[in-house]
Amino acid sequence: MDRIVVNSHIHFGKPCVAGTRITVQSILELLNDGLSFEEIIRDYYPDLQIEDIRACLQYAIALVAAEDIRLVSI
């Protein structure tokens, strides 16, 4: 995952696309809003490549996979 970096001096250490100040969170929010990869690149971040967006998804998957999730019934 060399396309995603964490630097404590950029966005307070939030994961970003390498070589940019674009956070993984920003990309995930746009995907959640229903935008396609192509729309994100065309309308928001023309310097990104499709592989950068895929890397954001892979990063999120890796985080969730590493969590110890415990469901609690209310």
Label for each model-derived stretch:
Residues 1-16:
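Short, Lys/Arg-enriched N-terminal segment that forms or immediately precedes the first helix
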Residues 23-74:
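Long, charge-rich, low-complexity alpha-helical segments
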